[in-house]
Amino acid sequence: MKILVIYDSQYGNTEQIAKAIASGLGIAGEVRTVKISEAKLGDITGINLLIVGSPTQGANATIAIQEFIKNLPDNSLKGVKYSTFDTRMTNKIIRMFGYASPKIAKGLEGKGATQTVQPVGFWVKGRKGPLKEGELERATKWAENIANALK
């Protein structure tokens, strides 16, 4: 199985989660991890599973993640399974407007992808982090569960 993990990260927290997820997915096949600033549309060619993650900013994914998904050709993800994640803070106002991962999921479905599991969020202690204790382990376990479900 060919797996691609695409992420954006401002302070390194989402990058840490992306790498933990890639580690957990390693049991399912060949995993590539690509920061959105280095991602190309051709990176999706031939993949079976796409994982996309972003910090939550203004109740959405980063502009770079949004633009990447928007620029994918229609139906370019047909036959590709996907999961999404975000990093987020505990905050009543943010909770009211929502988080990045469900919005990323909607964009990927619009390009033909099929969801494997519900979008997930990983907690940071503040705007710049760090990650809350146990989140890296939770990310690895989340990815292992996806990998096992796809076997």
Language-model features and meaning:
Residues 7-11:
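Aromatic-flanked redox-active Cys/Sec active sites in thiol-based oxidoreductases
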